[in-house]
A protein has these predicted regions:
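Helix-boundary/low-complexity linker signature
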Residues: 1-144
Length: 144
């Protein structure tokens, strides 16, 4: 039996940020279809020259992507959501830490998220809930 649930979409996202999110949504979805090594290669190129994103910048980008896409706002949209948020940050001249990994407690499921200042952005779980398998950090920084 399934339980219906409503998705929460951020409502207070400015129009300009929503426009930027719509702009990066198609590239994010296309990127999400690539194998992990290609995603990493593309993101490594895109992150060059960007400053590390603050938690506020990363959250604003994530909120904007969730506001314009029900798929990204949903429970199975983590990969395009995290890619879209990273690309939107890049449009603003910053780069969050983009991560993929798995939950550390059963059932072990794959997940993708963004981090800033060493903390997952708006995931609603403790910092150690996921373990990183791959990360694309801002240039000059190394993963934990």
């Amino acid at each position: 039996m399934t339980t219906p649930s409503a998705l929460e979409r951020p409502a207070d996202v400015p129009f300009v940020r929503k426009l930027g999110a719509r702009l990066v949504l198609i590239p994010a979805v296309v990127l999400s279809l690539l194998p992990p090594r290609r995603i990493r290669r593309v993101l490594n190129v895109l992150r060059r020259g960007a400053a590390p994103a603050t938690a506020t910048q990363a959250k604003n980008a994530r909120d904007a992507v969730c506001a314009v896409s029900l798929r990204c706002a949903g429970p199975r949209g983590c990969l395009p959501r995290s890619l879209g948020a990273a690309l939107l940050c890049r449009l603003g001249g910053t780069w969050p830490t983009w991560c993929t990994g798995a939950r550390v407690v059963p059932p072990f499921t794959a997940h993708a998220w963004i981090e800033a200042d060493g903390h997952p952005i708006d995931e609603g779980v403790p910092d150690d809930y996921f373990t990183r398998l791959m990360a694309v950090t801002p240039v000059g920084r190394h993963p934990r």
